[in-house]
Amino acid sequence: MATGTLTVDLGALVANYRTLDRLGPGATAAVVKADGYGLGAGLVSTGLAKAGACQFFVATAEEGVGLRQVLGPAPEINVFAGHMAGDTPLIRDAHLTPMLNSPKQVQRHRHVLPGHPYGIQLDTGMHRLGVQPADWPALRDQLHDATLLMSHLACADAPDHPQNAAQLAQFRALTDGIQTPRSLAATGGTLMGPDYHFDLIRPGVGLYGGLPFAGARPVVRLSLPVIQIRCVNPGATIGYGATYTATTPRQIATLSAGYADGLIRALSSKATLWDGDTPCPLVGRVSMDLLTVDVTDCDTPPEALDILGPHQTIDQLAEAAGTIGYEILTSLGPRYRRALTP
């Protein structure tokens, strides 16, 4: 049996896409990198394509090849990493559109794949990926056939951060007067308003129900099966390191999931799981394949518990672990059975 069942609410996913799409005046591309933020790129991209999405972004050419096999020849698939050495056959055969990040990538792409579509990523202040402003004047007038000019905001999850306005100004300074379509906003930038929208928005985490899209519908439910329930007496310790000691008689359920499945050790003795409306605290350490949960308050012995679902979002679980919803989502492991609800 799988370590758990990860259910994707396709209706919620599509609703989030359409809500974000209505905010932008131009096109909306779905970001499905990291295996669709951990949910299964094939599942989510197929659902989004049926809902009208025709442009997608992935991190690497290898991800793009897999997506092309699922979606067929029609959609545009863009690659954030650009045209890396060794990627040429993948980009050519899967008809991917790399976002070129440096003069070296521009030279490589135009030399080995002349006439093949490409976009340009510009570094407007994040100092991570993109053509640097000092290198742009020498390239600007040579790249009129680019499909897109894009950049990425470093602080879009904090709308009032001055870095956002600075990057917007830099992006405009680098691209104003060029007829090529432009894109600056992912989920956070989309929510900051029309100044950041340009011709294409690129929502990622907001599609999947994560912050900063506070109005998103929850997309993910993760139910974990109970292997065994035992009664422990006062003074008994639970799990590795004996970090939890029962002070009264407790019913402890052992569940089939652990840090190998993306439930990181930082959740140890901090997370809550749910049996219907009944909260059940995780006790002791998260181990590789197992969790131990106090189910004393459950009316009947549960067969499964929810760690993500109606009572707990990805960001609430992330808060318990001291991390962000992105990490929780993208860590969800391959041992879960993936399922869709319409």
Swiss-Prot record:
A GO cellular component annotated for this chain's UniProt record is: cytosol
Listed under GO biological process in this entry are: D-alanine biosynthetic process
Task: Look up the record and name the cofactor or cofactors this protein needs.
Answer: pyridoxal 5'-phosphate
Q: Can you provide one Gene Ontology molecular function annotated for this UniProt record?
A: alanine racemase activity
- Catalytic residues (UniProt): K33, Y240
Where, by residue number, does substrate bind? Answer: R128, M288
What InterPro entries does the database record attribute to this sequence?
Ala_racemase, Ala_racemase/Decarboxylase_C, Ala_racemase_C, Ala_racemase_N, Ala_racemase_pyridoxalP-BS, PLP-binding_barrel
| Pathway(s) it belongs to | Amino-acid biosynthesis; D-alanine biosynthesis; D-alanine from L-alanine: step 1/1
The record ties this protein, via SMART domains, to:
Ala_racemase_C
Q: Could you tell me the keywords of this UniProt record?
A: Isomerase, Pyridoxal phosphate
> Where are the N6-(pyridoxal phosphate)lysine modifications?
K33
* Catalytic reaction(s) noted: L-alanine = D-alanine
Where does the signal sequence lie? none
What Enzyme Commission number(s) does the record list for this chain?
5.1.1.1
Q: What does this protein do?
A: Catalyzes the interconversion of L-alanine and D-alanine. May also act on other amino acids.
- Family the entry assigns: Belongs to the alanine racemase family.
NCBIfam families for the chain:
alr (TIGR00492)
Identify this protein by name: Alanine racemase
Q: Which gene encodes it?
A: alr
